[in-house]
């Protein structure tokens, strides 16, 4: 691992963070690991998928991750299907809990503070794009299909269209 990334272990929740994002003011971000959650068995420990486990366990895992990352707001999620679809989310998506897109998408853009953009990856690439001047960000799930379709470029275009 390079000096650009570092592990953080807050209250037993181990996350990976990016120094560059910290330095440009995007301090509340993280890449999760499995360490620090309440899930057991094949899901252990920090399962964040509502489709595979009791809701109360998943909510507790999110609470722990958010606390470790210093985040206290709303989270947005989608059903990822290896597309090039990037959704814009804003203050209307602040539910005080979780907002799930009503259609498939593999990325989000926003300039709204207090929104956690959640993507899931296994063997795909998580992409975070940050614009420190506009205080806007994109979070992208880029698998081989999405990469071939140009999802990262779609996220950059959406950032430029929405925020200049």
Locations of regions flagged by a protein language model:
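Active-site microenvironment for binding and transforming phosphate-containing groups
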Residues: 1-164
């Amino acid at each position: 691992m390079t000096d650009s990334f570092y592990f953080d272990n807050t209250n037993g929740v181990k996350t990976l963070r990016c120094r560059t994002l910290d330095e440009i003011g995007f301090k509340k971000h993280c890449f999760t690991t499995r360490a620090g959650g309440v899930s057991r068995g094949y899901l252990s420990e920090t399962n964040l998928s509502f489709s595979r486990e009791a809701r109360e366990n998943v909510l507790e895992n999110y609470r722990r991750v958010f606390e470790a990352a210093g985040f206290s707001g709303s989270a947005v999620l989608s059903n990822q299907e290896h597309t090039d679809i990037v959704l814009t989310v804003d203050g209307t998506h602040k539910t005080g809990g979780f907002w799930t897109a009503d259609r498939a998408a593999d990325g989000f853009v926003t300039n709204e503070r207090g929104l956690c953009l959640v993507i899931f990856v296994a063997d795909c690439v998580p992409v975070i794009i940050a614009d420190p001047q506009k205080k806007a960000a994109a979070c992208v799930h880029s698998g081989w299909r999405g990469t071939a379709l140009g999802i990262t470029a779609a996220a950059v275009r959406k950032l430029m269209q929405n925020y200049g």
